[in-house]
Structures are given as structure tokens and as C-alpha cells.
Regions:
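N-terminal accessory targeting/assembly segments
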Residues: 1-4
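Single, functionally critical "micro-switch" positions that shape active/binding sites
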Residues: 24-25, 121
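Non-catalytic substrate-recognition/targeting regions of SAM-dependent transferases
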Residues: 6-23, 29-96, 103-106
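Conserved SAM/SAH cofactor-binding pocket of Class I
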Residues: 106-139
């Protein structure tokens, strides 16, 4: 398994009771995560100082509650810059765990010794396409 551990602008700080506390740049967001099944105390101070909290609705979907959070902001991963924005379905426009894949294929592209063309048919956020282009691929 590859772990996306080269982030400086993103981290999962804590998780409990079906939610995770994440740092996206200088902003703290709380979002639901169905894989967080443990019920540990939320003692991390970020739980009380969050900038955004996505509340899941019992009917499906949900809504954000904001506390001093801009409409959008940027974070960096190595030489890549991403614009983030909370969407109505809990996402921010980026999946940081995919950085391990960006590193892997970026290395393959740089070491190929030939022109590389990439057609990303799974370009949900554009992160992989941006990483491939930065590594030298024609996208």
C-alpha cells in the first residue's frame, strides 16, 4: 500500500464518531466519514476551532456550516497548487490520498526518456492530469 505522506498543506488530525478533522492549508474542516466507526473522545482542540463543518442529513446529502472560512483558497502539494472550495456534497475538490499515485506516475513520466502522452479518462478533480503535465507529459 502506498501512503500519501508528502503533504505539507493537508493532514488528517483526528477522527471519531463518524467524522474526521482535517487541516487543508490553514483551515480546519470536519467532514463525515463512514469508515470512522470508533467512539473515542474528541479531545483535539481543532474540534472546537474548526472553520467548516459538514452536517450529514438523515434524508441524504447535508450542508456546510462555516466559521471564518473563505469561499475558496489554495493549497500546495510539492510544485502543484490547487484551488479548494467546499461543495454541497461534502467534498473540497481534491482527494489528497491520490498524491501517492501522482508521485508514482510522475516519476515514471520523468524517467521515461521519451515524450509521454496522457489521456486521463478518470479526471474527476483534475489533480492527476495536473500532476502528469507538471511531470512533463502532454495531456
Amino acid at each position: 500500500m502506498w501512503i500519501a505522506d508528502n503533504w505539507k498543506d493537508y493532514e488528517v488530525i483526528d477522527c471519531s464518531k463518524g467524522e474526521k478533522l482535517e487541516r487543508w492549508g490553514k483551515y480546519l474542516l470536519v467532514r463525515p466519514d463512514p469508515q470512522v466507526i470508533w467512539d473515542t473522545p474528541k479531545t483535539e482542540k481543532g474540534w472546537r476551532k474548526m472553520n467548516g463543518h459538514y452536517h450529514r442529513s438523515a434524508k441524504g446529502g447535508g450542508e456546510w456550516e462555516f466559521f471564518d472560512l473563505p469561499e475558496q483558497w489554495t493549497i500546495n502539494y510539492k510544485e502543484l497548487t490547487f484551488n479548494l472550495k467546499p461543495f454541497s456534497f461534502k467534498h473540497t475538490g481534491l482527494f489528497p490520498e491520490q498524491a501517492a499515485n501522482w508521485d508514482w506516475f510522475g516519476d515514471k513520466i520523468r524517467r521515461s526518456g521519451r515524450p509521454v502522452k496522457v489521456l486521463n479518462l478518470f479526471a474527476y478533480t483534475g489533480g492527476a492530469t495536473l500532476a502528469a503535465a507538471k511531470a512533463g507529459a502532454s495531456v
